[in-house]
Regions:
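Inward-facing hydrophobic residues that define packing positions of alpha-helical scaffold repeats
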Residues: 275, 282, 287, 294-295
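Amphipathic alpha-helix face/heptad-repeat signature
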Residues: 267, 293-294
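Peripheral terminal and linker regions in Fe-S/redox and tRNA-modifying enzymes
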Residues: 1-279
Length: 298
C-alpha cells in the first residue's frame, strides 16, 4: 500500500476501505491525528480507497499506527481482495441486488481460500447492484451485476456474471463478456470455480487476463452452467445477502426502495428543486454551489 513519490523524499500511502464505507467520526479522527504529517488534501481513488500523500520516511511508522488503530491498515490495496462495489439496495433507488453484502462474502472467499491471490493486481472483482456500471463490473476480470430470476413461482435474487474485462494500459482496455446469470447466493461458488480453473489450467506465468481471453465466453458459460440450475434451489437462495425476508423487486425513491411511487414525477420534482437552489446560490454569489446544483438538475 506504499509507494515512493516522484517528488524526492516523499512517500504516498493507499488505504484499503472495505466497501468504501468510512464513518465521519473515523474520518475526522484520522485527519486530526495526521494533520501536518500528510498533505492537506486526501484523495479518493476509483476503487473506493483513500490516498495520503507527501509523507516523510520518518513519519511512515506513525501513519501506519494511526491506520492500524482505526482498522484501516489491511494490505492488498488494489488487489483482487480489494473488491469494488456500489451501494446497491442498501441505499440506491435503482438497485436490484445487495452488492455490498455480495462483496463482503466474496472478500471472505478470497482471503480464506485463495491467500496466494491477496497481492495479485492482475485480477479485479467488481460488483454493481443493477445493470448500470457504477461498480465498474464491465471492466472487471470477474464482474457481477444485480438481476433477478423466476423459479417455482417466486422471484430469486440473481447476479449476471461477466468475465474477461481489463485495463491493458496505453489507452487500451477490454470489456468483459456477459457469461451467465446465477442466483446471488451462488456468487462465492462462481468465484471459487473460476479461480480454481485458472490455478489448474493456466500456463506457467500466464495472467488471468490472457487466460480468460484465450478461453473465451463460451468456455466460461459451460464451466458455470451447473451453478445456474434452478431445480436445486434452497430456501436460503430466495433471500438476498444480508436479508432475512424473501426477495422482491420494487421501484422507489429515497433511501428505501420499498415505497412504490411514480419515479419519473419525483425525479422531475427533484430537478426543479435543484434549479431553485442553483438560482438562490447564484444570487448569493456562491458560484461553485450554483454550478453544482444546475448540473445536478440535468
Amino acid at each position: 500500500n506504499l509507494f515512493k513519490q516522484k517528488q524526492e523524499g516523499y512517500y504516498a500511502v493507499y488505504v484499503r476501505v472495505p466497501n468504501g464505507n468510512i464513518s465521519s467520526d473515523v474520518s475526522r479522527q484520522l485527519i486530526a491525528q495526521l494533520e501536518g504529517v500528510i498533505a492537506d488534501d486526501v484523495r479518493v481513488t476509483i476503487n473506493q480507497g483513500l490516498q495520503f500523500r507527501f509523507i516523510k520516511p520518518e513519519s511512515l511508522p506513525y501513519v501506519y499506527s494511526v491506520l492500524d488503530a482505526a482498522g484501516l491498515a489491511a494490505p492488498g490495496f488494489g488487489s483482487v481482495a480489494d473488491i469494488t462495489s456500489c451501494p446497491g439496495t442498501d441505499t440506491c433507488n435503482l438497485g436490484i441486488s445487495n452488492s455490498t453484502g455480495t462483496a463482503l462474502a466474496l472478500s471472505e472467499v478470497i482471503e480464506e481460500e485463495f491467500p496466494e491471490f491477496l497481492f495479485n493486481k492482475d485480477i479485479t472483482v467488481r460488483i454493481s447492484g443493477c445493470m448500470n456500471s457504477c461498480g465498474q463490473h464491465g471492466m472487471a476480470s470477474v464482474g457481477f451485476h444485480g438481476s433477478s430470476l423466476k423459479a417455482k413461482g417466486q422471484v430469486v435474487p440473481a447476479l449476471q456474471v461477466l468475465v474477461g474485462g481489463a485495463v491493458l494500459g496505453s489507452g487500451d482496455a477490454r470489456i468483459s463478456d456477459k457469461v451467465i446469470k446465477v442466483p446471488s447466493k451462488r456468487a462465492p461458488a462462481v468465484l471459487t470455480t473460476i479461480f480454481n480453473d485458472y490455478k489448474t489450467s493456466a500456463a506457467a506465468e500466464e495472467s488471468f487476463t490472457d487466460y480468460s481471453f484465450r478461453k473465451g465466453e463460451k468456455y466460461y458459460y459451460e464451466l458455470l452452467k451447473p451453478l445456474a440450475n434452478l431445480e436445486t434451489l434452497s430456501d436460503d437462495e430466495f433471500m438476498d445477502w444480508g436479508q432475512e425476508v424473501k426477495f422482491s423487486t420494487a421501484i422507489g425513491v429515497g433511501e428505501c426502495a420499498g415505497v412504490m411511487i411514480d419515479l419519473v414525477s419525483t425525479l422531475i420534482l427533484e430537478a426543479e428543486e435543484k434549479i431553485l437552489a442553483a438560482e438562490d446560490c447564484f444570487s448569493n454569489e456562491q458560484w461553485a454551489d450554483s454550478i453544482y446544483n444546475a448540473y445536478a438538475a440535468q
